[in-house]
Amino acid sequence: LAETNRTPFDLAEGECQVSVGFNTEYMHSSVGFALIMLSESEYASILFMSLFSVMFCLVVYSYLWSRGSYPRYRYDNLMHLCWKTSFTYIFNIPVFLLKPFSSGLKNKDPWLYNQPYSAFKTDALIGQGV
């Protein structure tokens, strides 16, 4: 950590070190100075790729764990899950996402106007598959 010369360990340089410091030989050619600074940037890519690898391993582990711990679905249970549960949830997502945008519209029916929960009657019917 101390070799990175970052905030806890960045030592103040004196005036003699500014004119005759360790960076003096790199100031005449910018290629050498750029190579020194680019060598420190590889740590960011190593850190990013290691975090990406850890996340990838966690996803693969959770996938394999769920496959190994749950029993196989019967075909009729799978069809019930897809058609009765997932299908209704997937098609209700746009209804609930667009509900805040439709709240400013006035209802023209005088019997439904200003009645509580009148806007959610259609959502309940859609959710029940009616």
Swiss-Prot record:
Per its record, how is this protein called by name? NADH-ubiquinone oxidoreductase chain 1
Q: Known catalysed reaction(s)? A: a ubiquinone + NADH + 5 H(+)(in) = a ubiquinol + NAD(+) + 4 H(+)(out)
Q: Which UniProt keywords apply?
A: Electron transport, Membrane, Mitochondrion, Mitochondrion inner membrane, NAD, Respiratory chain, Translocase, Transmembrane, Transmembrane helix, Transport, Ubiquinone
Q: Which GO terms describe its biological process?
A: aerobic respiration
Return the InterPro entries for the record. Answer: NADH_UbQ_OxRdtase_su1/FPO (IPR001694), NADH_UbQ_OxRdtase_su1_CS (IPR018086)
Q: Which cellular compartments is it found in? A: Mitochondrion inner membrane
Q: Carries keyword Electron transport?
A: yes
An example molecular function term from Gene Ontology annotations: NADH dehydrogenase (ubiquinone) activity
Q: Which PANTHER family match?
A: NADH DEHYDROGENASE SUBUNIT 1, NADH-UBIQUINONE OXIDOREDUCTASE CHAIN 1
Which EC number applies? 7.1.1.2
Membrane-crossing residues? 45-65
UniProt topology in membrane? Multi-pass membrane protein
UniProt-listed Pfam families: NADHdh
Q: Which family does it belong to?
A: Belongs to the complex I subunit 1 family.
Major localization listed first in the record, in broad terms: mitochondrion
Q: What does this protein do?
A: Core subunit of the mitochondrial membrane respiratory chain NADH dehydrogenase (Complex I) that is believed to belong to the minimal assembly required for catalysis. Complex I functions in the transfer of electrons from NADH to the respiratory chain. The immediate electron acceptor for the enzyme is believed to be ubiquinone.
On whether Transmembrane is a keyword of this UniProt record, the answer is: yes
To which species is this protein native? Artemia salina (Brine shrimp)
GO cellular component terms given for this protein: mitochondrial inner membrane
